[in-house]
Amino acid sequence: LRKVLEQWIGIAPFAAHPGKIYPTDKMEAVVAELSRLHPSSRIFLFGGGERERAVLAQWEQRYANCLDASHLLGSLAQELVLMSHLDVMVSMDSSNMHLASLVGTRVVSVWGATHPCAGFMGWGQSTDDVVQVPMPCRPCSIYGNKPCQRGGYPCLTQISPADIARKVELILNV
């Protein structure tokens, strides 16, 4: 891997359960904002399922600095090497959060139905890099696999794309 004069940002917008997935349109707004703020950056997209790949392919087409890393690299070992070179990873409370953490990459983690106080933060990560909305019903699920009792996961929909982009900016501009 070669990285010269550009910042590398990872985006892992998916998770195994709905209570852990930030709305796709809002995450695309994060991608758009980071692309606008950092036009010379490289934004690597991570996600492996068929539906996920379709979304990532659309983003790759819309934003010139985006690449679907999971499709391009094809193996977990190669993804881990790439993750180790990122300046920052944006991830849901998901396996990608943990993988990026294990290779020493700082992670802006987005939390919905789950909560970092349950003990599932990425290894070595700081609560300063957590994006979440305080709600009395959280955590409603330790694993994010239970339906939202309020309907529609407001714990995720009330998170602003600007809040996520701001956290990334704080890290990139250090």
PLM feature spans:
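Donor-binding and catalytic core of enzymes assembling or modifying cell-surface/extracellular glycoconjugates
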Residues: 24-113
